[in-house]
Amino acid sequence: MINLAAMRLFYFPKTKPGEPQQVITHPIGIGRVGWRTPEGNTRIVSKTAAPAWTPTAAIRKEHAADGDPLPKVVPPGPDNPMGTHVLRLGWPEYAIHGTDKPPSIGLRGTHGCLRMYPEDIVGIYDAVPVGAPVTVVNQPFLVGWRGDTLVMQTYPVLEDEKRKPHQRTDQLINRARKSMQGGYGARANVAVNQALVAEITQNPRAVAVPISTGNLTLQQYLAAAPRVANRLPQNATWDGDMRRQLKAADLMKKAAAP
């Protein structure tokens, strides 16, 4: 499962009967404006380690116009935009792959493919078989149940999104109220903190916030959250030096890639 608005991949490994469902999630980079990642259902049709990259005619034309002509084939190696591993989708010319530009993860920097950190793509490549179904959605607002509490998680709406999710929040909440997981009866009639819903849809934080809890504000909820220590992902190469900081313009420059 890919949620473009969240810029995250969610993998649900098969479980044995009686075992809880495990979810593995990773951040991704997605298609930039003008090169949107498609939505819908597809499958993994092939996998390749150490892939070569054959840019499409449209990509080569774009780069030539920018004074950066591309070869017909980019061989495997550290400068290959596909990274070390690729899982090709049933949609021609689209794939889930690594990258030679890690700062582009979490940004819209691709020609429609889905990029992953070099340290993340390896595990997904090894775990996901050819033929596995893939669903790509664009859902900036998510509503569900955490025990008896209705929660809402919001992400920024993509800038070229034509649909209007802000106009459908009531419909989304009502569907969650009546969901089989949430149950019927009292849960279907649970009161919703509409002021908080408005606050988190206008100021998305990607945090699941309880929206059926009195007069709670977003700041109150965040202030009460337990503090945790940030840890580097496995195999990360950052040395902890906080003095080297990239500006937004530097990140976007690094994200621009074939």
Predicted feature locations:
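Gly/Pro-biased beta-strand-loop elements
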Residues: 1-104, 123-127, 154-253
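Short beta-strand-centered segments at strand-helix junctions
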Residues: 111-125
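Short, solvent-exposed mixed-charge patches
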Residues: 257-258
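Short, charged beta-turn/beta-strand-edge "cap" motif at the junction between a beta-strand
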Residues: 35, 139-143
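Short, Lys/Arg- and Gly-enriched loop/turn segments at beta-strand edges
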Residues: 143-149
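Structural signal for conserved beta-strand scaffold positions within catalytic alpha/beta enzyme cores
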Residues: 43-46, 115, 136
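Loop/turn positions that initiate beta-strands
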Residues: 131-134
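Short, basic/aromatic beta-hairpin or loop at an interaction surface
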Residues: 102-112
